[in-house]
Amino acid sequence: MDYREFFSQFKYLSEKPGIGGRIKAQPEDFIVMEEPLRSAFDGKKYAIFLLKKRNWDTMAAVKEIAKRAGISYKDIGFAGTKDRHAVTYQYISVPRDAKEKVEAVRIKDIELRFVSYGRALKLGHLLGNRFKIIVRDVDESAFERTKEIVRELRSKGGFPNYFGYQRFGERRVTNHLIGKLLLKGDFEGAARLFLGAHGGGMEGDEARKNFWETGDVNRALEEFPGFLRYERAMLYRYKETGSWRKAFLSLPLPIMRIFIHAYQSYLFNLYISRRIEEGLPLNEALVGDIVVQIKGGIPYRDRTYRVTETNIDFVKEKIRKDEAMVSGPLFGFSMRRARGVPGRLEEELLAEENLSLKDFKRLPKPMAEPGGRRELLIRPLGLTYGYVPSVGMCFRFFLPKGVYATSVLREIMKDH
Protein backbone atom coordinates (compact mmCIF):
# COMPACT_ATOMS: atom_id res chain seq x y z
CA MET A 1 0.00 0.00 0.00
CA ASP A 2 1.39 3.43 -0.92
CA TYR A 3 0.49 6.66 0.87
CA ARG A 4 -2.22 7.60 -1.66
CA GLU A 5 -4.14 4.40 -1.03
CA PHE A 6 -3.57 4.75 2.72
CA PHE A 7 -4.91 8.33 2.78
CA SER A 8 -8.03 7.43 0.78
CA GLN A 9 -9.63 6.33 4.07
CA PHE A 10 -9.50 9.90 5.46
CA LYS A 11 -12.41 12.11 4.35
CA TYR A 12 -11.96 15.51 2.72
CA LEU A 13 -13.70 18.39 4.48
CA SER A 14 -14.29 20.38 1.29
CA GLU A 15 -16.76 18.98 -1.23
CA LYS A 16 -15.59 20.91 -4.28
CA PRO A 17 -13.37 19.09 -6.83
CA GLY A 18 -9.64 19.63 -6.45
CA ILE A 19 -7.20 21.26 -8.84
CA GLY A 20 -4.97 18.18 -9.20
CA GLY A 21 -1.38 18.93 -10.11
CA ARG A 22 1.98 17.94 -8.71
CA ILE A 23 4.18 19.24 -5.88
CA LYS A 24 7.93 18.83 -5.38
CA ALA A 25 8.64 18.43 -9.09
CA GLN A 26 11.95 20.03 -8.10
CA PRO A 27 13.31 21.07 -4.69
CA GLU A 28 12.82 24.79 -5.43
CA ASP A 29 9.07 24.17 -5.72
CA PHE A 30 8.85 23.54 -1.96
CA ILE A 31 10.58 26.18 0.18
CA VAL A 32 10.39 26.08 3.99
CA MET A 33 11.64 28.82 6.34
CA GLU A 34 11.66 28.07 10.06
CA GLU A 35 10.42 30.72 12.51
CA PRO A 36 12.40 30.26 15.77
CA LEU A 37 11.37 31.17 19.29
CA ARG A 38 12.95 34.43 20.45
CA SER A 39 14.36 32.59 23.44
CA ALA A 40 16.62 30.62 21.07
CA PHE A 41 18.89 33.67 21.00
CA ASP A 42 19.10 34.07 24.78
CA GLY A 43 22.49 33.02 26.13
CA LYS A 44 26.07 32.81 24.92
CA LYS A 45 27.12 29.16 25.30
CA TYR A 46 26.10 28.09 21.80
CA ALA A 47 26.62 29.42 18.30
CA ILE A 48 23.43 29.59 16.23
CA PHE A 49 23.70 29.00 12.48
CA LEU A 50 21.11 29.29 9.73
CA LEU A 51 21.26 26.05 7.76
CA LYS A 52 20.06 26.09 4.17
CA LYS A 53 19.80 22.65 2.60
CA ARG A 54 18.59 21.30 -0.72
CA ASN A 55 17.60 17.64 -1.14
CA TRP A 56 18.99 16.75 2.30
CA ASP A 57 17.09 15.21 5.15
CA THR A 58 17.72 17.11 8.42
CA MET A 59 19.37 14.26 10.34
CA ALA A 60 21.62 13.30 7.42
CA ALA A 61 22.69 16.94 7.03
CA VAL A 62 23.44 17.27 10.75
CA LYS A 63 25.54 14.10 10.75
CA GLU A 64 27.51 15.21 7.70
CA ILE A 65 28.16 18.67 9.19
CA ALA A 66 29.34 17.05 12.44
CA LYS A 67 31.62 14.66 10.55
CA ARG A 68 33.23 17.46 8.52
CA ALA A 69 33.60 19.69 11.59
CA GLY A 70 35.06 16.90 13.73
CA ILE A 71 32.39 17.09 16.44
CA SER A 72 29.68 14.70 17.65
CA TYR A 73 26.35 14.97 15.86
CA LYS A 74 24.79 14.88 19.34
CA ASP A 75 26.33 18.32 19.96
CA ILE A 76 24.25 19.84 17.15
CA GLY A 77 20.79 20.96 18.20
CA PHE A 78 17.82 21.70 15.97
CA ALA A 79 14.18 22.56 16.57
CA GLY A 80 12.48 20.46 13.91
CA THR A 81 13.03 18.08 11.01
CA LYS A 82 12.36 19.46 7.53
CA ASP A 83 11.36 17.89 4.22
CA ARG A 84 14.11 16.29 2.18
CA HIS A 85 12.78 16.99 -1.32
CA ALA A 86 12.76 20.74 -0.74
CA VAL A 87 14.85 23.83 -0.12
CA THR A 88 14.67 24.47 3.61
CA TYR A 89 16.04 27.04 6.05
CA GLN A 90 16.35 26.16 9.72
CA TYR A 91 18.46 27.04 12.75
CA ILE A 92 21.00 24.76 14.37
CA SER A 93 23.07 25.23 17.53
CA VAL A 94 26.64 24.06 18.15
CA PRO A 95 28.89 24.52 21.20
CA ARG A 96 30.49 27.96 21.12
CA ASP A 97 34.01 26.52 20.78
CA ALA A 98 32.96 24.66 17.59
CA LYS A 99 31.88 27.86 15.79
CA GLU A 100 34.99 28.24 13.61
CA LYS A 101 35.04 24.53 12.69
CA VAL A 102 31.43 24.70 11.51
CA GLU A 103 32.05 27.95 9.62
CA ALA A 104 34.78 26.16 7.66
CA VAL A 105 32.49 23.30 6.55
CA ARG A 106 31.77 23.08 2.82
CA ILE A 107 29.16 20.55 1.61
CA LYS A 108 27.32 20.39 -1.71
CA ASP A 109 23.74 21.70 -1.43
CA ILE A 110 24.31 22.85 2.17
CA GLU A 111 25.00 26.44 3.26
CA LEU A 112 25.75 27.57 6.82
CA ARG A 113 25.65 31.16 8.06
CA PHE A 114 26.46 32.22 11.62
CA VAL A 115 23.58 34.27 13.02
CA SER A 116 24.09 34.83 16.73
CA TYR A 117 24.97 33.24 20.03
CA GLY A 118 22.19 31.65 22.04
CA ARG A 119 21.07 28.48 23.76
CA ALA A 120 21.07 24.81 22.72
CA LEU A 121 18.16 24.16 20.37
CA LYS A 122 15.88 21.21 21.07
CA LEU A 123 13.03 19.59 19.16
CA GLY A 124 9.91 21.73 19.41
CA HIS A 125 11.75 25.00 20.09
CA LEU A 126 10.14 26.87 17.20
CA LEU A 127 7.00 28.86 16.46
CA GLY A 128 6.34 27.27 13.10
CA ASN A 129 7.30 27.44 9.44
CA ARG A 130 6.70 29.69 6.44
CA PHE A 131 6.08 27.97 3.12
CA LYS A 132 6.30 28.88 -0.53
CA ILE A 133 4.98 26.01 -2.64
CA ILE A 134 4.42 25.61 -6.38
CA VAL A 135 1.82 23.17 -7.72
CA ARG A 136 2.67 22.28 -11.32
CA ASP A 137 0.68 20.63 -14.12
CA VAL A 138 -2.42 22.79 -13.60
CA ASP A 139 -4.03 25.32 -15.95
CA GLU A 140 -5.33 28.83 -15.33
CA SER A 141 -8.74 27.56 -14.16
CA ALA A 142 -6.98 26.25 -11.02
CA PHE A 143 -7.03 29.78 -9.58
CA GLU A 144 -10.84 30.05 -9.53
CA ARG A 145 -11.20 26.49 -8.25
CA THR A 146 -8.73 27.24 -5.45
CA LYS A 147 -10.70 30.34 -4.55
CA GLU A 148 -13.92 28.27 -4.29
CA ILE A 149 -12.27 25.61 -2.12
CA VAL A 150 -10.67 28.17 0.21
CA ARG A 151 -13.99 30.03 0.54
CA GLU A 152 -15.79 26.78 1.41
CA LEU A 153 -13.17 25.77 3.97
CA ARG A 154 -13.18 29.20 5.60
CA SER A 155 -16.94 28.83 6.07
CA LYS A 156 -16.22 25.50 7.82
CA GLY A 157 -13.53 26.98 10.06
CA GLY A 158 -10.35 25.93 8.27
CA PHE A 159 -8.53 22.94 6.81
CA PRO A 160 -8.64 19.52 8.53
CA ASN A 161 -5.48 19.16 10.60
CA TYR A 162 -4.52 15.70 9.39
CA PHE A 163 -1.02 14.43 10.07
CA GLY A 164 0.72 14.30 6.69
CA TYR A 165 1.88 11.21 4.85
CA GLN A 166 5.46 11.88 5.99
CA ARG A 167 4.39 10.64 9.44
CA PHE A 168 3.54 7.17 8.16
CA GLY A 169 6.06 6.52 5.37
CA GLU A 170 5.71 7.48 1.73
CA ARG A 171 6.45 4.14 0.07
CA ARG A 172 6.29 1.64 2.92
CA VAL A 173 3.30 2.82 4.93
CA THR A 174 4.08 0.73 8.00
CA ASN A 175 5.13 3.08 10.82
CA HIS A 176 1.68 3.10 12.47
CA LEU A 177 1.34 -0.70 12.18
CA ILE A 178 4.70 -1.18 13.89
CA GLY A 179 3.55 1.23 16.61
CA LYS A 180 0.40 -0.79 17.24
CA LEU A 181 2.38 -4.04 17.52
CA LEU A 182 4.71 -2.39 20.05
CA LEU A 183 1.73 -1.25 22.12
CA LYS A 184 0.48 -4.83 22.16
CA GLY A 185 3.88 -6.05 23.34
CA ASP A 186 4.48 -7.95 20.10
CA PHE A 187 8.15 -7.04 19.64
CA GLU A 188 8.74 -9.96 17.29
CA GLY A 189 5.92 -8.86 15.00
CA ALA A 190 7.13 -5.24 15.13
CA ALA A 191 10.72 -6.25 14.35
CA ARG A 192 9.71 -8.53 11.48
CA LEU A 193 7.57 -5.78 9.94
CA PHE A 194 10.33 -3.18 10.38
CA LEU A 195 12.86 -5.50 8.75
CA GLY A 196 10.71 -7.24 6.17
CA ALA A 197 8.16 -4.77 4.79
CA HIS A 198 9.02 -4.09 1.17
CA GLY A 199 7.61 -2.47 -1.94
CA GLY A 200 7.83 0.89 -3.63
CA GLY A 201 10.94 0.08 -5.65
CA MET A 202 13.37 0.97 -2.88
CA GLU A 203 16.95 -0.24 -2.68
CA GLY A 204 17.16 -3.25 -0.37
CA ASP A 205 13.63 -4.43 -1.18
CA GLU A 206 14.80 -7.84 -2.42
CA ALA A 207 16.67 -8.50 0.83
CA ARG A 208 13.65 -7.36 2.86
CA LYS A 209 11.36 -9.63 0.81
CA ASN A 210 13.62 -12.61 1.42
CA PHE A 211 13.62 -11.96 5.16
CA TRP A 212 9.83 -11.50 5.17
CA GLU A 213 9.41 -14.91 3.52
CA THR A 214 12.10 -16.88 5.36
CA GLY A 215 12.89 -15.10 8.64
CA ASP A 216 16.51 -16.14 8.08
CA VAL A 217 18.62 -13.75 10.18
CA ASN A 218 22.01 -14.96 8.90
CA ARG A 219 20.92 -14.58 5.28
CA ALA A 220 19.53 -11.12 6.05
CA LEU A 221 22.89 -10.04 7.51
CA GLU A 222 24.55 -11.15 4.28
CA GLU A 223 22.00 -9.45 2.02
CA PHE A 224 20.95 -6.24 3.80
CA PRO A 225 22.97 -3.33 2.32
CA GLY A 226 25.24 -1.37 4.65
CA PHE A 227 23.13 1.81 4.55
CA LEU A 228 20.34 -0.06 6.40
CA ARG A 229 22.37 0.41 9.56
CA TYR A 230 19.46 0.31 12.03
CA GLU A 231 18.12 -2.88 10.48
CA ARG A 232 21.55 -4.51 10.55
CA ALA A 233 22.11 -3.44 14.17
CA MET A 234 18.78 -5.02 15.12
CA LEU A 235 19.67 -8.27 13.35
CA TYR A 236 23.06 -8.44 15.09
CA ARG A 237 21.41 -7.78 18.45
CA TYR A 238 18.91 -10.58 17.86
CA LYS A 239 21.73 -12.94 16.91
CA GLU A 240 23.52 -12.06 20.16
CA THR A 241 20.51 -12.34 22.48
CA GLY A 242 17.88 -14.48 20.74
CA SER A 243 15.34 -11.87 21.91
CA TRP A 244 13.32 -9.73 19.48
CA ARG A 245 12.39 -7.45 22.39
CA LYS A 246 16.06 -6.72 23.16
CA ALA A 247 16.78 -6.42 19.44
CA PHE A 248 14.04 -3.84 18.92
CA LEU A 249 14.98 -1.89 22.03
CA SER A 250 18.53 -1.56 20.66
CA LEU A 251 17.20 1.07 18.23
CA PRO A 252 17.80 4.73 19.17
CA LEU A 253 14.93 6.10 21.26
CA PRO A 254 13.92 8.75 18.66
CA ILE A 255 13.48 5.99 16.06
CA MET A 256 11.35 3.86 18.40
CA ARG A 257 9.16 6.81 19.28
CA ILE A 258 8.46 7.47 15.59
CA PHE A 259 6.37 4.30 15.52
CA ILE A 260 4.30 5.13 18.62
CA HIS A 261 3.71 8.68 17.37
CA ALA A 262 2.70 7.34 13.94
CA TYR A 263 0.04 5.15 15.54
CA GLN A 264 -1.24 8.07 17.63
CA SER A 265 -1.35 10.14 14.43
CA TYR A 266 -3.27 7.44 12.56
CA LEU A 267 -5.93 7.34 15.28
CA PHE A 268 -6.14 11.14 15.33
CA ASN A 269 -6.66 11.20 11.55
CA LEU A 270 -9.36 8.55 11.91
CA TYR A 271 -11.07 10.70 14.56
CA ILE A 272 -11.21 13.75 12.26
CA SER A 273 -12.45 11.61 9.37
CA ARG A 274 -15.12 9.96 11.55
CA ARG A 275 -16.32 13.34 12.75
CA ILE A 276 -16.65 14.58 9.14
CA GLU A 277 -18.39 11.34 8.15
CA GLU A 278 -20.97 11.71 10.93
CA GLY A 279 -21.64 15.34 10.02
CA LEU A 280 -20.23 16.66 13.29
CA PRO A 281 -18.63 20.12 13.06
CA LEU A 282 -14.90 20.63 13.44
CA ASN A 283 -15.22 24.35 14.17
CA GLU A 284 -18.13 24.25 16.60
CA ALA A 285 -17.84 22.87 20.12
CA LEU A 286 -20.16 20.14 21.33
CA VAL A 287 -20.86 19.40 24.98
CA GLY A 288 -18.07 17.09 26.10
CA ASP A 289 -15.47 18.44 23.66
CA ILE A 290 -12.02 19.50 24.86
CA VAL A 291 -10.88 22.83 23.37
CA VAL A 292 -7.35 24.24 23.17
CA GLN A 293 -6.47 27.89 23.66
CA ILE A 294 -5.23 29.90 20.67
CA LYS A 295 -3.13 33.05 20.90
CA GLY A 296 -1.99 34.93 17.80
CA GLY A 297 -2.90 31.96 15.64
CA ILE A 298 -0.65 29.62 17.67
CA PRO A 299 -2.29 26.73 19.58
CA TYR A 300 -1.28 26.17 23.20
CA ARG A 301 -2.02 22.46 23.43
CA ASP A 302 -1.23 22.24 27.14
CA ARG A 303 -3.98 24.77 27.91
CA THR A 304 -7.30 23.00 27.51
CA TYR A 305 -10.76 23.06 29.00
CA ARG A 306 -13.86 20.92 28.71
CA VAL A 307 -17.10 22.13 27.13
CA THR A 308 -20.15 21.84 29.40
CA GLU A 309 -23.79 22.87 29.24
CA THR A 310 -22.83 25.82 31.42
CA ASN A 311 -19.89 27.23 29.44
CA ILE A 312 -20.78 26.24 25.87
CA ASP A 313 -21.90 29.73 24.80
CA PHE A 314 -18.70 31.22 26.22
CA VAL A 315 -16.61 28.60 24.35
CA LYS A 316 -18.43 29.19 21.07
CA GLU A 317 -17.66 32.90 21.37
CA LYS A 318 -13.98 32.10 22.02
CA ILE A 319 -13.92 29.92 18.88
CA ARG A 320 -15.63 32.66 16.85
CA LYS A 321 -12.94 35.12 17.97
CA ASP A 322 -10.12 32.64 17.06
CA GLU A 323 -9.16 32.30 20.73
CA ALA A 324 -9.94 28.57 20.96
CA MET A 325 -10.28 25.47 18.78
CA VAL A 326 -11.96 22.11 19.16
CA SER A 327 -9.41 19.33 19.72
CA GLY A 328 -9.07 15.64 18.99
CA PRO A 329 -7.27 12.86 20.84
CA LEU A 330 -3.58 12.01 20.79
CA PHE A 331 -4.18 8.85 22.78
CA GLY A 332 -1.88 8.26 25.75
CA PHE A 333 -2.00 7.17 29.37
CA SER A 334 -2.72 10.65 30.80
CA MET A 335 -4.66 12.22 27.91
CA ARG A 336 -7.62 14.39 28.88
CA ARG A 337 -10.64 12.54 27.50
CA ALA A 338 -13.71 14.01 25.86
CA ARG A 339 -17.24 13.20 26.99
CA GLY A 340 -20.65 13.21 25.33
CA VAL A 341 -20.78 12.55 21.58
CA PRO A 342 -17.06 13.37 21.06
CA GLY A 343 -16.22 11.00 23.91
CA ARG A 344 -18.30 8.27 22.26
CA LEU A 345 -16.25 8.61 19.07
CA GLU A 346 -13.03 8.28 21.07
CA GLU A 347 -14.34 5.19 22.87
CA GLU A 348 -15.42 3.60 19.58
CA LEU A 349 -11.95 4.08 18.09
CA LEU A 350 -10.30 2.50 21.13
CA ALA A 351 -12.74 -0.42 21.03
CA GLU A 352 -12.21 -0.99 17.29
CA GLU A 353 -8.45 -1.09 17.85
CA ASN A 354 -8.82 -3.27 20.97
CA LEU A 355 -6.84 -0.61 22.79
CA SER A 356 -6.72 0.84 26.29
CA LEU A 357 -5.01 4.06 27.34
CA LYS A 358 -3.12 1.94 29.87
CA ASP A 359 -1.39 0.22 26.94
CA PHE A 360 0.59 3.42 26.40
CA LYS A 361 2.00 3.13 29.93
CA ARG A 362 2.98 -0.53 29.58
CA LEU A 363 5.61 0.36 27.00
CA PRO A 364 9.26 0.33 28.15
CA LYS A 365 9.68 3.50 30.21
CA PRO A 366 11.41 5.80 27.69
CA MET A 367 8.71 5.00 25.12
CA ALA A 368 5.68 5.37 27.41
CA GLU A 369 3.44 8.02 25.88
CA PRO A 370 1.28 10.38 27.99
CA GLY A 371 -0.68 11.65 24.97
CA GLY A 372 -2.44 14.99 24.67
CA ARG A 373 -4.82 16.98 22.50
CA ARG A 374 -4.45 18.49 19.02
CA GLU A 375 -6.66 21.03 17.27
CA LEU A 376 -8.93 19.58 14.56
CA LEU A 377 -8.49 22.44 12.12
CA ILE A 378 -5.63 24.29 10.43
CA ARG A 379 -5.96 28.01 9.78
CA PRO A 380 -2.97 28.91 7.61
CA LEU A 381 -1.84 32.43 8.47
CA GLY A 382 -1.23 34.88 5.62
CA LEU A 383 -2.50 32.46 2.97
CA THR A 384 -1.98 33.92 -0.51
CA TYR A 385 -2.05 32.19 -3.88
CA GLY A 386 -1.90 32.97 -7.57
CA TYR A 387 -1.47 31.42 -10.99
CA VAL A 388 1.90 31.90 -12.70
CA PRO A 389 1.74 31.24 -16.48
CA SER A 390 3.85 28.27 -17.63
CA VAL A 391 4.58 27.42 -13.98
CA GLY A 392 1.40 26.67 -12.02
CA MET A 393 -0.22 27.74 -8.76
CA CYS A 394 2.00 29.40 -6.17
CA PHE A 395 0.98 29.29 -2.48
CA ARG A 396 2.46 31.13 0.51
CA PHE A 397 1.42 30.68 4.15
CA PHE A 398 2.61 30.17 7.74
CA LEU A 399 1.77 27.12 9.87
CA PRO A 400 2.38 26.50 13.59
CA LYS A 401 4.85 23.75 14.51
CA GLY A 402 3.67 20.19 14.01
CA VAL A 403 1.21 21.13 11.26
CA TYR A 404 1.68 19.77 7.73
CA ALA A 405 1.68 21.90 4.59
CA THR A 406 0.84 18.77 2.58
CA SER A 407 -2.43 18.50 4.52
CA VAL A 408 -3.37 22.04 3.46
CA LEU A 409 -2.57 21.24 -0.16
CA ARG A 410 -4.39 17.89 0.00
CA GLU A 411 -7.74 19.66 0.36
CA ILE A 412 -6.96 21.92 -2.59
CA MET A 413 -5.42 19.32 -4.90
CA LYS A 414 -7.50 16.26 -3.86
CA ASP A 415 -4.50 14.19 -4.97
CA HIS A 416 -4.38 11.62 -2.15
UniProtKB/Swiss-Prot annotation:
Active-site positions on this chain: 83
Pfam families in the record: TruD (PF01142)
Keywords, alphabetical: Isomerase, tRNA processing
Domain called TRUD: residue spans: 158-379
Gene Ontology molecular-function annotations: RNA binding; tRNA pseudouridine(13) synthase activity
Enzyme Commission code: 5.4.99.27
Biological processes annotated in GO: tRNA pseudouridine synthesis
Catalysed reaction, written as an equation: uridine(13) in tRNA = pseudouridine(13) in tRNA
Reported function: Could be responsible for synthesis of pseudouridine from uracil-13 in transfer RNAs.
Assigned protein family: Belongs to the pseudouridine synthase TruD family.
Protein name per Swiss-Prot or TrEMBL: Probable tRNA pseudouridine synthase D
Taxonomic source organism: Thermococcus onnurineus (strain NA1)
